[in-house]
Amino acid sequence: MSPQTETKAGVGFKAGVKEYKLTYYTPDYEPHDHDILAAFRVTPQPGGPPEEAGAAVAAESSTGTWTPVWTDGLTWFDRYKGRSYHIDAVPGGENPFIAYVAYPLDLFEEGSVANMFSSIVGNVFGFKALRALRLEDLRIPPAYTKTFQGPPHGIQVERDKLNKYGRPLLGCTIKPKLGLSAKNYGRAVYECLRGGLDFTKDDENVNSQPFMRWRDRFLFCAEALFKAQSETVEIKGHYSNATAGTCEEMIKRAVFADELGVPIVMHDYLTGGFTANTSLAHYCRDNGLLLHIHRAMHAVIDRQKNHGIHFRVLAKALRLSGGDHIHSGTVVGKLEGERDITLGFVDLLRDDFVEKDRSRGIYFTQPWVSLPGVIPVASGGIHVWHMPALTEIFGDDSVLQFGGGTLGTPWGNAPGAVANRVALEACVQARNEGRDLAREGNEIIRQAAKWSPELAAACEVWKEIEFEYEAVDTL
């Protein structure tokens, strides 16, 4: 043994492998107000003790590696390490458990979702000692929240810009999502906005393809928007998708939209990436553009119950990164979404302060301090018969978005938009009169259809359409 090795060994270094729990499992630790807290659903390999598995997660997502290293002695280890401080059993689960981990705030770069996720959901998710790992929730402390701009504008500013109050907003995704020319696409936008919708939308995979380049689409959609505005005397918007192959190209598209004078642009925040999304959110605030966020790719990450990242975490990350709208599921439509869980992360998007509530999947009390709220967007397989339930579930601060439920009506696009607007106005009026939308919803729609032939036609088409499948992701 060399003299240097003997000296280092004498002050505590010992090469080899030791159990993570000896360093990273600290059940007596009281989390600090400034710590970032994480709740992980951990499925260890057979025979693996929960304390060791939870400590391994804390180690591999903070300062640890598989063996002690010399340079551990050159840092203030207790200050920077993550700590597995509590373990909960999962009700009804044979093997998984919830491990709570506290991370010191100094581990994270200010204002960077990318850096936060590189640590907390980095290599640890491929760790062989774990069969599966899922990040269920994060507590973002105010000290870290205040380093982010957050949404470009927020709910109240959007309502003021649009001059629309007291009801949910209505939208429509233009279909077919791929294949239309820019001029025909703009025609569909005009017909939907003229029929009474507040917004139309590019689908998530509409970027700049050979059949419709982005600049042509932006121009025809802006023309349609302004024509519909002049005829309805209502402020309208179209979510022009600025998502691109590079950040520079994305910003160029947003600049062009701003020069056209349109009120809103769109971004696919998961496929585009958090760094690009935050850059676009900053541009939108500086230039008065609203920012609609699509969550394309989310189900790859969040749908499996035991592995991945729950959408409530992705929703919190979006509120930090920036967006004025985000798709949130519908509860009643064609896409995955259990009611209590969905309402839990809808509150996390909109409210200033959300209390811990395990019945809705909220593991931590979350204060948002001054960060603006985000409007949830209900979209996917919904139609006029769903309007009472959607109005009751999501309330006024929401966007209810009907693609096929507008463009698939028998009389055409504009009558489809009329049907949705009439159904919404009827539900809002009934709610304001004290009627129970959950119990009387179908009757409310039938009564409104008596004086709206457009709604009557839509009701006839969709009367037997339901998506009755159990949610995969449950509490």
From Swiss-Prot:
Known EC number: 4.1.1.39
A Pfam family this chain is assigned to: RuBisCO_large_N
Principal location: plastid
The entry's keywords: Acetylation, Calvin cycle, Carbon dioxide fixation, Chloroplast, Disulfide bond, Lyase, Magnesium, Metal-binding, Methylation, Monooxygenase, Oxidoreductase, Photorespiration, Photosynthesis, Plastid
Residues modified to N6,N6,N6-trimethyllysine: K14
Gene3D superfamilies noted in UniProt: Ribulose bisphosphate carboxylase, large subunit, C-terminal domain, RuBisCO large subunit, N-terminal domain
Prodomain positions: 1-2
Post-translational modification: The disulfide bond which can form in the large chain dimeric partners within the hexadecamer appears to be associated with oxidative stress and protein turnover.
Any single GO BP term: photorespiration
Catalyzed reactions per annotation: 2 (2R)-3-phosphoglycerate + 2 H(+) = D-ribulose 1,5-bisphosphate + CO2 + H2O; D-ribulose 1,5-bisphosphate + O2 = 2-phosphoglycolate + (2R)-3-phosphoglycerate + 2 H(+)
Entry's Gene Ontology cellular component terms: chloroplast
Cofactor descriptive note: Binds 1 Mg(2+) ion per subunit.
Modified residues (N6-carboxylysine): K201
Function noted in UniProt: RuBisCO catalyzes two reactions: the carboxylation of D-ribulose 1,5-bisphosphate, the primary event in carbon dioxide fixation, as well as the oxidative fragmentation of the pentose substrate in the photorespiration process. Both reactions occur simultaneously and in competition at the same active site.
Additional record remark: The basic functional RuBisCO is composed of a large chain homodimer in a 'head-to-tail' conformation. In form I RuBisCO this homodimer is arranged in a barrel-like tetramer with the small subunits forming a tetrameric 'cap' on each end of the 'barrel'.
Name of the featured protein: Ribulose bisphosphate carboxylase large chain
Species for this entry: Plumbago auriculata
Gene responsible for this protein: rbcL
